[in-house]
């Protein structure tokens, strides 16, 4: 088993010029061909699923493909502006890069994340001040650890796993739409010929029409129509399935007959 840090994450190259699906996909293909040296079962979560789809559609390096809640269609072109990722992480990354007061992106993101807008006006200011101060104390004491904040939901803290080594310029690539290198997601999916499994997290739409998920049901149907070899498993949880439902996640990978179409 190989765990690969894509550019802009972990210990990988932090070069903003490489933050696009072509450069990252080709890097993964090179790694498989020159290090693993045989076709692999490739799993990609979120934007990693877009990269994995590129690998599967542009090489014979992938024998089995697992797409964990990948944001097909919803994060590209004008539609991206109506997704939670755009108004949250991508916009916060953009704002962080255009200011010089705060140097700690983890703390900046916690303080500016979109979720604060879901709190009532009566409680938001007090809670924001108190919890941001708590986050700042934790960051000062444990700068190399994943953020922990008392009373903050576990699912909400999942986003901070590995954020210490996250380059906000990666999020900026989704803000500007440059990540996709002008490759339509339809073209990525049409080229996939290997057995494929899509792991779908819960779909939620906000009262304002904002997509509070990585893709909606219509997007999912489009994925399944474009990839005849794709099967589907749903999970009643948020975006980070492998963190929120680890046992069910592993069970799905170990027991499901990937490639056998399952009715929605």
Provide a role label for each language-model segment.
Residues 2-43, 54, 78-79, 83-84, ...:
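Active-site loop/oxyanion-hole signature of alpha/beta-hydrolase fold enzymes
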Residues 6-10, 72, 238-239:
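Alpha/beta-hydrolase active-site loop signature
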Residues 38-81:
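Conserved hydrolase catalytic core segment
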Residues 66-114, 118-123:
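Flexible "cap/lid" loop of the alpha/beta hydrolase fold
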Residues 125-187, 203:
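Hydrophobic, aromatic-rich cap/lid helix
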Residues 190-236:
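Conserved loop-alpha-helix segment in the C-terminal half of the alpha/beta-hydrolase fold
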Residues 234-246:
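Catalytic histidine-centered segment of alpha/beta-hydrolase-like enzymes
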Residues 243-255:
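Post-His helix in hydrolase/transferase enzymes
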